[in-house]
């Protein structure tokens, strides 16, 4: 794991937004990444669009469709990161990709390219923990963190996954696919307590956070939150405006205001 990611996760109270690369166009992705940094993002999770995204709900599936329709690929998505860096992005970037595009690209080639491009880590939701060793070794060679996902399961399995965790541990906060949920799963608190006891690294909660109240609640039990579907939905609502250079800035500003509303309580007058 490199210094940039190590320093970022040390701070605690992490805000990790997710966006899909190329949704709806590459220029919008760069502008949104910089906007999320302005809002206080500690780490950016950059999703690689995929035609069969099993772990994603309809909002992120639609984002993938939009990005793929625009010609986005794994290679092109990775190449956005040095452009973001050139524009002033300083926070760590974690790439979220399914195993199939990664296998086609090649583990070694991916890790070398990611390192060259200023990418800090990788998250592969459909790669079983038991089959992750080869990729973990390639990541280690290049100083990339292979982020582990952990779901409510046996204490023994949580301990096994946590013992090899790098960077931070990504906890699934509600059962099933991702998506903005109104309520959190009732067993989440007990699950997070188990993770806290087992994890040597900070742990964050994702999959379903969509309000300031949920962010605050999760902050009491975890070291941070991942917010994906709620942000991606706002991008989808402004898809046409984000495609056009003349309307993009205003659309990005509106999304930034929405993100700020998730992180700060509404003012009381």
UniProtKB/Swiss-Prot annotation:
The protein's annotated pathway: Amino-acid biosynthesis; L-tryptophan biosynthesis; L-tryptophan from chorismate: step 5/5
GO (cellular component) term, any one: cytosol
EC number: 4.2.1.20
Lineage: superkingdom: Bacteria
Single annotated GO MF: tryptophan synthase activity
Reaction(s) catalysed (UniProt annotation): (1S,2R)-1-C-(indol-3-yl)glycerol 3-phosphate + L-serine = D-glyceraldehyde 3-phosphate + L-tryptophan + H2O
Active-site residues, as the UniProt record annotates them: 45, 56
Keyword Plastid assigned: no
Assigned keywords, A-Z: Amino-acid biosynthesis, Aromatic amino acid biosynthesis, Lyase, Tryptophan biosynthesis
Main EC class the enzyme belongs to: lyase
Any matching Pfam family: Trp_syntA
PROSITE patterns xrefs: TRP_SYNTHASE_ALPHA
UniProt entry tagged with the keyword Nuclease: no
SUPFAM superfamilies reported in the protein's UniProt record: Ribulose-phoshate binding barrel
Its biological purpose: The alpha subunit is responsible for the aldol cleavage of indoleglycerol phosphate to indole and glyceraldehyde 3-phosphate.
Family membership noted in the UniProt record: Belongs to the TrpA family.
UniProt-listed NCBIfam families: trpA
Complex formation: Tetramer of two alpha and two beta chains.
Official protein name in the record: Tryptophan synthase alpha chain
């Amino acid at each position: 794991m490199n210094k940039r990611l190590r320093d970022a996760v040390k701070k605690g109270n992490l805000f990790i937004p997710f966006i899909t690369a190329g949704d709806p166009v590459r220029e919008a992705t760069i502008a949104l990444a910089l906007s999320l940094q302005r809002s206080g993002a500690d780490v950016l999770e950059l999703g690689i669009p995929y035609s069969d995204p099993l772990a994603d709900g309809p909002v992120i599936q639609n984002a993938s469709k939009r990005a793929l329709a625009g010609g986005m690929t794994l290679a092109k998505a990775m190449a956005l990161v040095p452009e973001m860096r050139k524009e002033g992005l300083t926070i760590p970037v974690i790439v979220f990709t399914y195993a199939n595009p990664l296998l086609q690209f090649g583990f070694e080639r991916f890790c070398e390219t990611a390192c060259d491009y200023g990418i800090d880590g990788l998250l592969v939701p459909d790669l079983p923990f038991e089959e992750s060793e080869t990729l973990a070794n390639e990541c280690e060679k290049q100083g990339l963190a292979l982020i582990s996902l952990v779901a409510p399961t046996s204490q023994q399995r949580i301990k096994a996954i946590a013992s090899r965790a790098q960077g931070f541990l990504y906890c699934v906060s509600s059962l099933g696919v991702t998506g903005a949920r109104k309520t959190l799963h009732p067993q989440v608190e007990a699950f997070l307590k188990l993770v806290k006891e087992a994890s040597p690294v900070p742990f964050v909660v994702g999959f379903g956070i969509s309000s300031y109240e949920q962010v605050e609640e999760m902050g009491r039990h975890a070291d941070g939150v991942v917010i994906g579907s709620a942000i991606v939905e706002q991008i989808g609502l402004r898809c046409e405006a984000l495609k056009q250079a003349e309307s993009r800035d205003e659309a990005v500003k509106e999304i930034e205001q929405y993100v700020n509303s998730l992180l700060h309580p509404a003012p009381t007058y």
